[in-house]
UniProtKB/Swiss-Prot annotation:
Gene from which the chain derives: purA
Name this polypeptide is given: Adenylosuccinate synthetase
Pathway where it operates: Purine metabolism; AMP biosynthesis via de novo pathway; AMP from IMP: step 1/2
Function: Plays an important role in the de novo pathway of purine nucleotide biosynthesis. Catalyzes the first committed step in the biosynthesis of AMP from IMP.
Coiled coil: none
Lineage, broadest ranks: Bacteria, Pseudomonadati, Pseudomonadota, Gammaproteobacteria, Cellvibrionales
Record: residues binding IMP: 14-17, 39-42, 130, 144, 225, 240, 304
UniProt similarity note: Belongs to the adenylosuccinate synthetase family.
Binding residue positions for GTP: 13-19, 41-43, 306, 332-334, 414-416
Keyword Ligase (UniProt): yes
Amino acid sequence: MGKNVVVLGTQWGDEGKGKIVDLLTEKVSQVARFQGGHNAGHTLVIEGKKTVLHLIPSGILHDGVTCMIGNGVVLSPEALIKEIEELEANGVEVRSKLKLSPACPLILPYHVALDLARESKRGDAKIGTTGRGIGPAYEDKVSRRGLRLGDLLNEQRFAAKLAEVLEYHNFALTQYYGAEPVDYQEVLNKALELGAQLRPMIADVVDMLHTSRENGEHILFEGAQGSLLDIDHGTYPFVTSSNTTAGGTATGSGFGPLYLDYVLGITKAYTTRVGSGPFPTELECDVGKHLGEKGHEFGATTGRQRRTGWFDAVAVRHAVRINSMTGMCLTKLDVLDGLSEVKICVGYKDSNGAVIGIPCDAEGWADVQPVYESMPGWTASTVGAKTMEELPVEAVNYIRRLEELVGIPADIISTGPDRVETIVLRHPFEG
């Protein structure tokens, strides 16, 4: 009997999902992306070699694994072809193993132009998007005017739809944002050229997933970003434009929720965030600087320096609930090595001292003050540990306390960037 496992981030992204997906892929026949676009970066380190993926599932580095991009992913043909060519230049076979849903909404140059124009107009109130057209592409999908990958299979139909939607967006670009219009013919020619390369990879992803399930094969669903960036459950409006939570797995792939066996929450041992938005436990001091430098906290997609802070158990417990998580994988434990004291946010209070729960808007988040619990740190190194017995007792106590606070066990603990630097207490595909 096969198992179907979802891997998600429990924080604001950058939790280390890429390494864990790569580790788990050894057991599966298929890996599927179900939301987001090329705004997310998945960094893998295998035998010392670093690979950064943005659209293609991390399982592409494994032989015999089919990688799928489901209908919930907004797809930039240009970004995808570039990523394919980069992998091929490094000797990785991609095209025969990658399958694309024809229902994927397309990201085209006018989406990028809109994204950049909006952020520029917002000024200091900007959301902090990656400027890659993700939000505008999802807007087109919801408004039912968006072009989809399957439209490229009929060039005349694609050209007609493009003319209509580009007229709409060029009006906004020129008349509201004061930006330059996007050239129709350039967009059309480039899209058709790239579409010809993508056409052989277009497949019925829904049917392929269910055929694998019926054949008793293991399937892994790879989430992007993190639960606190979810369009509905995140720190709105400082969120992404898709459902990054477990519910998005079903809608973004066509794989029913009752078929999912295990939801693994990837959880950093401290907290980071890229760009604007609420961050109750942020540290603007030497400890925060230490976490950023030791953790190499720079975005895989944008290169922007990440903000750093203590572990927020309130936020992670919220993520556990909305995802019905089975267990967590604790990553970057080694970054806390050398600290004499570690703190955990165990509650929120407002400016009047009243205990509060998870706010529902930016104004509510602005009033949040963290309530901390302190624990002894550890000086011994945790780097490369493969068993709990190799960890300092203080590190073990820290892990156990996090388990108590968020309500799920730490089934996997990552002690370094390489896949072998991992403690596996309960394997999602074996337990």
